[in-house]
Curated annotation (Swiss-Prot):
Cited PANTHER family: CRISPR-ASSOCIATED ENDONUCLEASE CAS1
Class of enzymatic activity (EC top level): hydrolase
Name of a matching Pfam family: Cas_Cas1
Cofactor: Mg(2+); Mn(2+)
GO BP annotations, alphabetical order: defense response to virus; maintenance of CRISPR repeat elements
GO MF entries: DNA binding; DNA endonuclease activity; metal ion binding
InterPro entries in the record: CRISPR-assoc_Cas1, CRISPR-assoc_Cas1_C, CRISPR-assoc_Cas1_HMARI/TNEAP, CRISPR-assoc_Cas1_N
Family note: Belongs to the CRISPR-associated endonuclease Cas1 family.
Cross-referenced CDD domains: Cas1_I-B (cd09722)
Organism: Methanocaldococcus jannaschii (strain ATCC 43067 / DSM 2661 / JAL-1 / JCM 10045 / NBRC 100440)
Designated name of the protein: CRISPR-associated endonuclease Cas1
EC number of the protein: 3.1.-.-
NCBIfam families documented for this protein: cas1, cas1_HMARI
Subunit structure: Homodimer, forms a heterotetramer with a Cas2 homodimer.
Length: 322
């Protein structure tokens, strides 16, 4: 059975009875086919029994929680079953060594830049960011790398804006709260992508709290933020572009809140449905010579990072060809 992500938008109760997990809400009680669940995303107010959590942990199923506004709150991360002390040592060494850390930080951003270029080409704009990549290669500090990344994104959003409908202009990238509909859509998709990357990291031997571009902090899986630099343009931005240009997402799917604009419940439902479909879409992998899902591409990227950390093969970021 092919496993899929489960999204819970309504309020309810998640509990275990014998060897079955049930979700109960105002519409009734429904058993969940646990063997077909990859991970769970909870947007409603959901109570969970300890027995259900124990069972989900045994099955290696991560749960990701989002607040009332659709932003990521945190994860229930089952005990890791894939351990490698050797990899942990190498992962930390690459953080502590300034040159090794800087190399990886640059590669994550270069991957993101090239995927932004590819998006613009698909949006009918042939702009190249080669001058930024040259500048990036000359950076000697992480803060300098982040500065270049910020300027590239500002230019990218400006160029992307030229192709967007009048009702869905970015104008200026704003967050928490986003100031218009397009900013709200981009932020919501980025917030959904981040825990999807966390799930993939859980299924590798990597330690998700040790990162290179983003500074490791308590209470966040910062390695997922590193990898998101590559996948935000490839998955979140491209999906946002399609949703507004095809009229799938409209003004009616948003609400004014907290001095900003947010997706309403119906808008969240529509976006999440399309996001899950997007993650399950397959592309023909040029090197593997077979079809892989976009979700799987994230796992493969993590495996490439493992090979770099243990000295098997230098990491090269994924650049979209599809």
């Amino acid at each position: 059975m092919r496993k899929k992500s489960l999204t819970l938008l309504s309020d309810g109760y998640l509990f275990r009875k014998e060897n079955t997990i049930y979700f109960e809400n105002a519409r009734g009680k429904k058993p969940l086919a646990i063997e077909g669940i990859y991970d769970i995303y909870i947007y409603g107010k959901v109570s969970i029994s300890s027995q259900a959590l124990h069972y989900l942990a045994q099955k290696g199923i991560a749960l990701h929680f989002f607040n009332h506004y659709g932003y990521y709150d945190g994860s229930f991360y089952p005990r890791e079953s894939l351990h490698s002390g050797y990899l942990v040592v190498n992962q930390v060494e690459h953080y502590l060594d300034k040159d090794k850390r800087l190399e990886l930080a640059k590669l994550f951003i270069i991957g993101g830049i090239k995927n932004m270029e590819w998006n613009l080409l698909k949006f009918k704009n042939k702009t190249k960011f080669s001058s930024y990549i040259e500048e990036l290669n000359n950076c000697n500090k992480i803060t300098e790398v982040m500065n270049v990344e910020g300027r590239v994104r500002t230019e990218y959003y400006r160029l992307w804006d030229e192709t967007l409908p009048d009702d869905f202009k970015i104008v200026k990238r704003t967050r928490r709260p986003p100031k218009n509909e397009m900013n709200a859509l981009i932020s919501f998709l980025n917030s959904r992508l981040y825990p999807a990357i966390i799930t993939e990291l859980y299924n590798t031997q990597l330690t998700p709290t040790v990162s290179y571009l983003h500074e490791p902090h308590e209470r966040r899986f910062s390695l997922a933020l590193d990898l998101s630099e590559i996948f935000k343009p490839m998955i979140a931005d491209r999906l946002a572009n399609r949703l507004v240009k095809q009229g799938i997402i409209q003004k009616k799917h948003f609400r004014d809140d907290l001095n900003g604009v947010l997706l309403n419940k119906e808008g969240m439902k529509v976006v999440l449905e399309h996001f899950n479909k997007e993650m399950d879409k397959t592309v023909n992998h040029k090197k593997l010579k077979k079809n892989v899902s976009k979700r799987r591409l994230i796992r493969l990227e993590a495996y490439k990072l493992v090979k770099h950390l243990v000295g098997q093969k230098r990491y090269e970021p994924l650049v979209a060809w599809f």
